[in-house]
């Protein structure tokens, strides 16, 4: 079975919440483990139990984040209370708090805090017709993906224009806001 050891050679990426509540690590095999505060399911364990504040919660006892059958992560990024993974085939999956649509599901339902919400049950973010991601990044309450065509799409809270869409309207928190309906960041030519 896959493990994340304490060896610095196995863990290839770490991402920490900007306010220090939780973190995630990705192994060289593409497996993800998250620890810390879990009030919104941001650890991806299917519950809201904090992990690492008691004995026997880390190491082999710390669960992997289920990303889906035969899926591995090539990158991870965490926001204040949500996390996203770029998967091996170019899809993006996000979980945790979703109060501003930062998970990109077209609603504000948090994911990862209950059973049957992760793994194959967790839908990928709709990036648009025939689009895949090559990089991901998260902010406090928003998420972005660099797409295979060189465009950038962002979703979530947009109170300061952080989505780069020419207005201050939040995206990803209602139907018909993702996929081809989500405008790419206009960076000029």
Residue ranges: model-predicted function:
Residues 1-3, 35-58, 95-118, 155-178:
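Short glycine/serine- and acidic-residue-enriched loop/turn motifs that recur at repeat junctions
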Residues 1-8, 58-61, 67-70, 118-122, ...:
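Trp- and S/T/G-rich repeat-edge/linker motifs of beta-rich repeat architectures
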């Amino acid at each position: 079975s896959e493990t994340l050891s304490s060896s610095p050679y196995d863990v290839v990426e770490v991402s920490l919440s900007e306010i220090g509540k939780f973190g995630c690590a990705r192994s060289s095999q593409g497996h993800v483990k998250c620890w810390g505060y879990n009030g919104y399911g941001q650890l991806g364990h299917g519950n809201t139990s904090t992990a690492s504040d008691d004995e026997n919660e880390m190491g082999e006892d710390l669960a992997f984040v289920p990303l889906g059958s035969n899926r591995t992560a090539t990158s991870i990024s965490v926001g204040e209370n949500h996390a996203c993974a770029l998967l091996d085939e170019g899809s993006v999956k996000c979980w945790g708090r979703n109060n501003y649509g930062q998970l990109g599901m077209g609603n504000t339902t948090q994911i990862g805090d209950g059973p049957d919400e992760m793994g194959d049950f967790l839908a990928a973010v709709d990036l648009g017709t025939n689009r895949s991601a090559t990089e991901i990044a998260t902010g406090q309450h928003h998420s972005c993906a660099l797409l295979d065509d060189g465009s950038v799409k962002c979703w979530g809270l947009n109170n300061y224009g952080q989505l780069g869409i020419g207005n201050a309207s939040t995206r990803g928190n209602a139907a018909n806001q993702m996929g081809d309906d989500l405008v790419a960041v206009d960076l000029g030519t």
